[in-house]
Amino acid sequence: MTKFMFFGFSTFLITTEDGLNILIDPYIDDNPAAPMKCADLPKIDLILASHGAFDHMKDTGKIAMRDQSRIICGGETMNLLLDQGVPKELITQTVWGLAVRQCGITVRPVVSMHRSSVRLSDGTAMDGFALGFIIYLPDGTRVYNASDTALFSDMKLIGELHHPQVGLMNVTIENCFDFLPEFLTGEMTPYEAALASQWLGLEYAVACHYTNKDNKDVAEFESILNLMKDKNGTGSPVPVIMNPGETFVYPLKKK
C-alpha cells in the first residue's frame, strides 16, 4: 500500500510500502494549513521540487540539509538551492523527458504548462519551466504530479505512455497572499482538471492546490467527476478530496 498525506497547497508526503518517504513540493512551515512543521516530519528520503514558486519548494533546502534527502528538480530550481547552501551532490537536475532514478525510485519528468521563476540572493533572476512528474513506485504504482499545469491535449499522450493510476491534480488557486493579484481561476478550472484526469486514464484523481476542501472549486471538481462516472460507468476517475492532514491509501482495501 502507498500512503498519500496532504499538507495543503500542493505538498504531499508519499510513503511507500517499504517505508520510503517522498516529499512533493514542500511548503510547510509558512503554510497555515499544514498538519505539522518541518521539524516534525519523518526522515525524508527524496524530494521532488516541480518549480521555483515559494509555495512549492520553500522548505526544500532546510529539509534536504537536515536529512541528506535527494532532490529532483529543474535547472533554475537547482541554482536557487545551491544559492541556499544545499550540497550539489544531493541534487539531480533534469528536464522534460529525462528519466532519473534516486532512492530506488524512477521519476520521469513530463511537460507542465507552467513557468518557474527564481531570484538568487545577489538579485539574479532565473526563469525556467515547471516539471510534471511520473513517479514509478516499487510496488507498481504510477503517480502523476501535475505541478500547476494548465490543460493541454498531450495529457492524453502522457496517459497512453505511462498509465498513471493516481494523479495529484491542481483544481483551484488560493487567493490568500496580499502581494499577488486576485486570480479568477487556477491554472486549470475544475472542469479542465476533471477532463485532464479522464484523459490521463486515472483511477483516482487527488485534488490539490487548496487549504480547505470546502473550497467551491474543489466541490465542483468532485461533482464533475462524479457526473462523469455516472455517465460513463466504470473507468472514470474517482475523486479524492482531503483536508490537510488527511491520508489517502492506494490501493483501497476491497470490501
Give the label of every model feature segment.
Residues M1-K3, T15-I22, A99-R108, L137-V143, ...:
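Beta-strand-turn-beta hairpins that frame and shape the catalytic cleft
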Residues M1-N21, Y27-P32, V110-M113, L227, ...:
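Zn-dependent metallo-beta-lactamase
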Residues F4-F6, Y27-A34, L90-Q93, S147-T149, ...:
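Short gly/ser/thr-rich secondary-structure transition/capping motifs
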Residues L13-K62, C73, S116-L120, A125, ...:
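Pre-active-site segment of Zn-dependent metallo-hydrolases
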Residues P26-I28, G52, S112-M113, S147-T149, ...:
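Active-site metal-binding loops of divalent metal-dependent hydrolases
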Residues M36-V100, G104-V118:
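Active-site HxH/HxHxD metal-binding segment of metal-dependent hydrolases
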Residues I72, E76, A150-E246:
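Cap/insert and terminal regions of metallo-dependent hydrolase folds
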Residues P109-T141, T149-D154, L161-H162, V166-L168, ...:
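Active-site-proximal loop/helix segment associated with metal-binding centers of metalloenzymes
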